[in-house]
């Protein structure tokens, strides 16, 4: 009900959004996500390995293990949506240097994987000063740009405003802060892009 309501609100405002869905939710609510896709919204794959019976965060696993976890999720997604996903987001932004090549190997094309400056090793989520803007990731180092055929669109952050004892940057999740703080995060991001000359 919440996903359908969010889709209706966004459609009424003339917006198209991306819903990333864990396989267990897709199995139960596939019809809702097919409706949302028919309205022009994007539906992609979201992985929390624990929801698939695994013990660790996604970024703890090696290349072959990540491919296996992804393929399990892709199979469920394809059964419900009638197609394979192209978009992907890992739970907790958990990833390692195997992740982008693994995403490429299973045919995923784009998504929100990185959270620049986030430092939560307990979630296998360490992003350092990774790129703030959309980019092709490096094949051997997740924090650099490179030639992996996957477009990473990092979460919008304010690297100067820190949460959780400094481990996490302010981002645009609605549950974190109020609209005024989100305005500042957006404003700073736009000004940064304009100053750098890379806003298009």
Q: Where do the PLM segments sit?
A:
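N-terminal regions that are enriched for targeting/export leaders
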Residues: 1-8
